[in-house]
């Protein structure tokens, strides 16, 4: 098996599409750069086909966060943007292709994460994940091939740097109360109250239904406390935290074409 990680810098600011793609869309530099990504992926598929491995290669295309500014595309109907724990900052598309293994044209509403890729790719390639440490992700191959509808994980946690800001289980998402809410840019926001949203009915996170659902709030607060105990929160180290990796004697190499 082979593994290729291809991180496009597009469409991150500054918007700099290649010369031959400028003016090829009706959406300015952003749209032009999207056109270039589309071309780039086409070249990748051509190469796979030329090598005769097109039918036996899993291709996964996704992103790391929502757009940061309007000129980088819209996050609607989601609320918020990059750097925030609203759905618009956290939720991204994921397109997966594997002819004969993943049904063409199928879709899934299951919530998954990039941390699931390690155990998933290991499972489908016949490998094993390390047994001497905790692996945070889960094997989501049954979701990708359409045999499973939901993720085995019971709760997801939304952190802004080292601050736990929200927790989600199913379609219910709770923003926990905070004396000061951290942000990526600018000063922290002021005190925040508990807010509960039903994402199945309120994808833009407009209607706080915490008062009407005390049992759901209680359940999600318990998940939040479990996260703090394991992963930590501001000024509170978690019992499950690992030390950052460190290379004592690094030997970087410059690859020249």
PLM regions and their residue ranges:
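Beta-strand elements within well-structured catalytic alpha/beta cores of enzymes
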Residues: 2-7, 34-37, 41, 58-63, ...
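Histidine-centered active-site microenvironments of extracellular/periplasmic hydrolases
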Residues: 13-17, 23-33, 39, 46-101, ...
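C-terminal cap/loop subdomain of S1 sulfatases and analogous C-terminal strand-loop tails that border
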Residues: 67-87, 102-110, 115-195, 199, ...
């Amino acid at each position: 098996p082979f593994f290729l990680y291809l991180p496009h810098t597009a469409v991150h600011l500054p918007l700099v599409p290649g010369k031959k793609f400028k003016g090829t869309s009706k959406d300015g530099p952003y749209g032009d750069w999207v056109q270039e990504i589309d071309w780039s992926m086409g070249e990748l598929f051509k190469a796979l086909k030329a090598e005769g491995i097109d039918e036996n290669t899993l291709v996964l295309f996704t992103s790391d966060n929502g757009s940061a500014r309007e000129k980088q595309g819209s996050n609607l109907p989601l609320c918020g943007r990059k750097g925030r724990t609203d759905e618009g900052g956290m939720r991204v598309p994921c397109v997966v292709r594997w002819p004969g293994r993943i049904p063409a044209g199928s879709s899934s509403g299951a919530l998954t994460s990039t941390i699931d890729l390690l155990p998933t790719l290991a499972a489908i390639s016949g490998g094993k994940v390390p047994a001497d440490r905790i692996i945070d992700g889960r094997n989501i191959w049954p979701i990708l091939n359409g045999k499973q509808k939901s993720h085995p994980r019971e709760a997801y946690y939304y952190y802004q740097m080292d601050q736990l800001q929200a927790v989600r289980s199913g379609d219910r998402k709770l923003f926990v109360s905070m004396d000061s809410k951290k942000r990526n840019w600018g000063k922290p926001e002021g005190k925040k109250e508990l807010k509960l949203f039903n994402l199945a009915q309120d994808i833009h996170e407009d209607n706080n239904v915490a008062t009407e659902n005390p049992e759901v709030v209680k359940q999600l607060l318990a998940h939040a406390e479990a996260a703090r105990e394991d992963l930590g929160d501001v000024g509170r180290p978690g019992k499950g935290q690992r030390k950052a990796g460190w290379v004592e004697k690094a030997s970087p190499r410059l690859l020249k074409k």
